[in-house]
Amino acid sequence: MFDCMEALGMGPRQLYDVTNRGACMLRKASPFYAGLDPFAWTGTASVRSVETQSTSSEEMVPSSPSPPPPPRVYKPCFVCQDKSSGYHYGVSSCEGCKGFFRRSIQKNMVYTCHRDKNCQINKVTRNRCQYCRLQKCFEVGMSKEAVRNDRNKKKKDVKDEVIPPESYELSGELEELVNKVSKAHQETFPSLCQLGKYTTNSSSDHRIQLDLGLWDKFSELSTKCIIKIVEFAKRLPGFTTLTIADQITLLKSACLDILMLRICTRYTPEQDTMTFSDGLTLNRTQMHNAGFGPLTDLVFAFAGQLLPLEMDDTETGLLSAICLICGDRMDLEEPERVDRLQEPLLEALKIYARRRRPNKPHMFPRMLMKITDLRGISTKGAERAITLKMEIPGPMPPLIREMLENPEAFEDQSESTEKKPEPEPPAPPPPALLTMKKEQEDEDDSWATENGSEPSPEEEDDDDEDGEEERGTDSDGEAWGGQEPNADVSRKSHGGRAQ
């Protein structure tokens, strides 16, 4: 075979080239070029077959991912030649120079150079002269406007993140609770704008120990205010469902707190005065002389702290209710029940305050912190009541004595200053807080029916024994009879005291 090829003047390689060229021409001329291979039919040109298979197998292998682009390299910091972190405020700069320039512009910093205002600024010396560093920032092209725009953008982002007021919605039950508490507060405590102010010139220039005229007026107004606080408490949802003992305990514990909160909301900072419920307006000196004494400056300071809170009547009423219905008071019979009654009040004040001030979420905790301040003032007030008893010529008004003083401490003071005709066992504390408006309990009604007379609001009912009603119909001693073996002595003592 090779001899024939040699006779034609063609070697094996030349024959393969001719055959290969013919096959290529055939494939290009065929409409089925993509799927036909003449060598596959004839079985010749095995080398070409292997080459075709190799090429097809390479096409099936997935190509490798392209390599990541090289990290972007910035020019060195234009200010100090340190490594740059990017373009900031218009020029390539490092993090240190970026922050320095931003702080200097935002805070309007004024620097001073202690040399010739031409200090060299580089990576090592940049912190030695702030004046020259800032000047170089300007020289290389850093922009003030870029800093301001960046600051405004941040402020806008913060505003966009604020939860809209619509998200602070009171449920139906809480809305009803807020309305009831607000109405109870407004109807028992008129606002400052509803009062006709009037003043007095009594001892308004200098402080004295006690102005008896102002004291008489102050004690009269305080008694009326205490009655209004009791009425406010009775109108709070759920308060009257507590035990009688717990109602009395809560009122005694919180009455001075609420009294101080109410009077401090009528503070006028321009004149440095406070206005009472009848419109009487006293300045700081007159408040001192009316009986506040060393408590005066503390009360006025607290009134000034309330001003930034800008509390409305609803918030004042809710805070008063929270202060009153508080389960951590001493001697409560059912503190857990009191706490459960307080929880919706706390939730209502939180939602109401945030809905009223959506951009000031800190106002609610600041309001609650005022309860602690009020308790501190109340403690000082109880101490002041003891010393005030020594200054006034007559007895302390009953309600003020009951509300503003520690009963045990008062008894100790009164025993040391007054001589009693004969000792007698102390009577239980009178339930005057719950009988302000002649509303007696069922026991009082039955007592009055059996004896034909009404009990004194300063006496507490005792259990009567058989026969006691008949011989005590003409004396106040009937309420005290039948309790101890020395009933006759007790009746005489109380009868004489009533006269």
From Swiss-Prot:
Q: Where is this region: Modulating?
A: 1-76
Where would I find the NR C4-type zinc fingers in this protein? 77-97, 113-137
Q: Which GO terms describe its molecular function?
A: DNA binding; nuclear receptor activity; RNA polymerase II cis-regulatory region sequence-specific DNA binding; zinc ion binding
Keyword annotations for this protein?
Answer: DNA-binding, Metal-binding, Nucleus, Receptor, Transcription, Transcription regulation, Zinc, Zinc-finger
Q: Where in or outside the cell? A: Nucleus
Q: Which InterPro entries match?
A: NHR-like_dom_sf (IPR035500), NR_DBD_RAR (IPR047159), NR_LBD_RAR (IPR047158), Nucl_hrmn_rcpt_lig-bd (IPR000536), Nuclear_hrmn_rcpt (IPR001723), Retinoic_acid_rcpt (IPR003078), Znf_hrmn_rcpt (IPR001628), Znf_NHR/GATA (IPR013088)
Specify whether DNA-binding is a keyword of the entry: yes
Top-level taxon in the UniProt lineage: Eukaryota
Mainly resides where? nucleus
Q: Tell me the Gene Ontology biological-process terms attached to this UniProt entry.
A: cell differentiation; liver development; negative regulation of transcription by RNA polymerase II; pharyngeal system development; positive regulation of transcription by RNA polymerase II; retinoic acid receptor signaling pathway
Q: Does the keyword Plastid apply?
A: no
The segments labelled Hinge in the record are 143-172
Q: Where is the composition biased (Acidic residues)?
A: 456-477
Q: Which residues bind DNA?
A: 77-142
Q: Where is the NR LBD domain?
A: 173-407
A cellular component term from Gene Ontology for this protein is:
nucleus
One short Pfam name that applies is Hormone_recep
**What's this chain's function?**
Receptor for retinoic acid. Retinoic acid receptors bind as heterodimers to their target response elements in response to their ligands, all-trans or 9-cis retinoic acid, and regulate gene expression in various biological processes. The rar/rxr heterodimers bind to the retinoic acid response elements (RARE) composed of tandem 5'-AGGTCA-3' sites known as DR1-DR5. Required for hindbrain development and for the development of pharyngeal arches.
What is its quaternary makeup? Heterodimer; with an rxr molecule. Binds DNA preferentially as a rar/rxr heterodimer.
Q: Which family does it belong to?
A: Belongs to the nuclear hormone receptor family. NR1 subfamily.
What does its UniProt record remark on the domains? Composed of three domains: a modulating N-terminal domain, a DNA-binding domain and a C-terminal ligand-binding domain.
Q: What is this protein called?
A: Retinoic acid receptor gamma-A
Name the source organism. Answer: Danio rerio (Zebrafish)
